Amino acid sequence: MDREEALERLRSARVGRLATVTPEDRPHVVPFVFAVVERDLDVIAYWVVDRKPKRTERLQRLRNLERNPGAELVVDGYDEDWRALWWVRASGSGRVVEDASDERGAALSALAAKYPQYASDPPSGPVVAIDIERISGWRARLEAPS
């Protein structure tokens, strides 16, 4: 899979898995919704702490990124026909976006454009950016084996 196909699959994915590193150097993986924004040569995946039920807005993934900004996100397509399988992995650095910034507004707009729930009930929690540094992907052969 080339970079453009990987980016398109990343942009169109409805849900992904976000991996961060805990203070104990253990992986912490959670499902999350996100929007990809491209500016010049930069690719950024944004997510926001929204109103879905949570114990706190100070999520483990936020604490992890404050300590170690390394992050990886994965999206994939599963099919019982394994010739249609694919995945995309994007690695980068996470950061909390400033509350009063233009970037926050752009991120929330991108999220609302992708997820109607955010348009009707705008989230007020922290916005997080993953500045993507590497993207790769794989897909199975679509043709039947001979």
Where does each model-flagged region fall?
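Short coil-to-beta transition motif at edge beta-strands of beta-rich domains
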Residues: 68-70
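Residues at secondary-structure transition points
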Residues: 1, 56-60, 83, 102
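Short beta-strand segments
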Residues: 14-54, 73-76, 86
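Intrinsically disordered, low-complexity coil segments
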Residues: 37-44, 55-57, 99-106, 145
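Charged, gly/pro-rich active-site loop segments
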Residues: 78-146
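Short amphipathic alpha-helical segments and helix-helix/interface helices
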Residues: 6-7, 59-62
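Short, basic/aromatic recognition patches
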Residues: 1-17
